[in-house]
UniProtKB/Swiss-Prot annotation:
Prenyltransferase specific for geranyl diphosphate as prenyl donor and coumarin as prenyl acceptor. Can use umbelliferone and esculetin as substrates, and with a lower activity, 5,7-dihydroxy-coumarin and 5-methoxy-7-hydroxycoumarin. No activity with 5-hydroxy-7-methoxycoumarin, bergaptol, xanthotoxol, p-coumaric acid, caffeic acid, 2,4-dihydroxycinnamic acid, kaempferol, genistein or homogentisate. No activity with dimethylallyl diphosphate, farnesyl diphosphate or geranylgeranyl diphosphate as prenyl donors. Belongs to the UbiA prenyltransferase family. This is Coumarin 8-geranyltransferase 1, chloroplastic. InterPro entries: UbiA_prenyltransferase, UbiA_sf.
Length: 407
């Protein structure tokens, strides 16, 4: 039964169906505005008085309405949760991407620092040199057995590791000087700590010597020990050491390692202890030792030109600071011209026609390229002089290819 009451307070009452029959429930309805004012005409009280049957019927109706509303709201809630989860997933993915990118950048930076730390131009020279020397004792394709390749890889690895030791120990000993001369090097720039660099040098040297000992080859073991001792004496700042500050001792170190150890120790190792043949010193080996020794002496002089500023600052008297950059450059270029002239004469005396032709044309070409490159050197620019030094390393690589045509 519906009863209507007029009341200015607009507080409708309803006999709520979920309560007991005969109870009264007051409902507060919102006021509306009409043209800026309250619409009082709609302010009425509504009271609903429910009987027992009416209460049951209304309750079922309300439940049905609630179920209908719930069904209608389910899709919205589902999509709302999905969108929220997607946003959370996107945020999580973005954080993961940032962390992944940051880790990748740090890893790549460290790997690049390690790459620079090994002085790759010298490492390439070692790979080319040892490979070339390993080929000299071969007499036929039948010598290229699996055992030969395995022994070659072991010897090459020991040489590369020792070469890297010499380059890294030099950087560990020259951190302060390199901050002036070569600020881009890993230790000088701070990309690697000195402790890390020292640990790497120890691992490199010990691993190289361990491989040599495992091969049980006296010439190889002897050569690597000499290489280790000279590399240490060249760089380490101890009494009677640090030979790099003396032009004669510095040149002697490079000549012995590149000109003699490379050639004879590794050649005898491959010829006697890998191929099982008696030791025979060949003409190409002698030629390689002579011309590589000359190029090595030149490189020991050239490398001091871009380092002159730092050497002066720390009180080191290099040959470049004594004679002047221009005189040292001229001396190096003339020494290489002389070596290539001798190489052309030796090649012309070869009985192997193809070897004669390749040797003459090859060394003449290298001499011509050297002359062209020397014209472009700017002695006032350290980057230019260092670039020329790296160019001489390329001549070093090229010579190891040409020695095989001298038969």
């Amino acid at each position: 039964m519906l009863q209507m009451h007029s009341n200015s307070s607009f507080s409708p009452k309803c006999y709520y169906p979920l309560q007991h029959a005969g109870c009264v429930k007051t409902l507060q309805l919102p006021l509306t505005k009409v043209h800026g004012g309250l619409n009082r005409s709609e302010s009425k009280n509504y009271a609903i008085k429910c009987t027992q049957s009416d209460s049951f019927y209304s309750t079922n109706k309300i439940r049905n309405n609630e179920n209908s509303s719930s069904r209608n709201c389910k899709p919205f809630n589902k999509y709302r949760v999905a969108v929220t989860l997607q946003q959370q997933d996107c945020a999580s993915n973005n954080e993961d991407d940032i962390n992944s990118t940051s880790f990748r950048d740090v890893l790549l930076k460290k790997l690049h620092a390690l790459y620079v730390f090994t002085r790759p131009f010298a490492m390439i020279g070692t790979i080319v040199g040892i490979t070339s020397i390993a080929i000299l004792p071969l007499q036929s394709f039948a010598d290229l057995t699996p055992k030969y390749f395995m022994e070659f890889l072991k010897a090459l690895l020991s040489a590369v590791l020792m070469n890297n030791y010499v380059g890294t120990v030099n950087q560990v000993a020259d951190v302060e000087i390199d901050k002036v001369n070569k600020p881009g090097l890993p230790l000088a720039s701070g990309d690697l700590s000195v402790g890390t660099g020292l640990a790497i040098t120890l691992i490199l040297s010990l691993t190289s010597l361990a491989i040599a000992l495992s091969l049980q080859s006296p010439p190889l073991i002897f050569g690597l020990i000499v290489w280790f001792l000279l590399g240490t004496a060249y760089s380490v700042d101890l009494p009677f050491l640090r030979w790099k500050t003396n032009p004669f001792l510095a040149g002697m170190c490079m000549v012995i390692v590149f000109g003699l150890v490379y050639q004879f120790s590794f050649f005898i190792h491959f010829q006697k202890y890998v191929l099982g043949r008696p030791v025979v010193i060949t003409r190409p080996l002698i030629f390689a030792a002579a011309i590589i020794s000359t190029i090595s002496a030149v490189m020991s002089l050239l490398k001091d030109i871009p380092d002159e500023d730092g050497d002066k600052q720390f009180g080191y008297q290099s040959i470049s600071s004594k004679l002047g950059k221009e005189n040292v450059l001229r001396l190096c270029v003339y020494a290489l011209f002389f070596a290539y002239g001798v190489a052309v004469i030796v090649g012309a005396s070869s009985s192997f026609q193809l070897g004669k032709l390749v040797s003459i044309i090859g060394h003449s070409t290298l001499a011509f390229l050297l002359w062209l490159r020397a014209q472009t050197v700017d002695l006032s620019n350290n980057a230019s002089t260092f670039s020329f030094y790296l160019f001489v390393w390329k001549l070093f690589y090229g010579e190891y290819l040409l020695i095989h045509f001298l038969r």
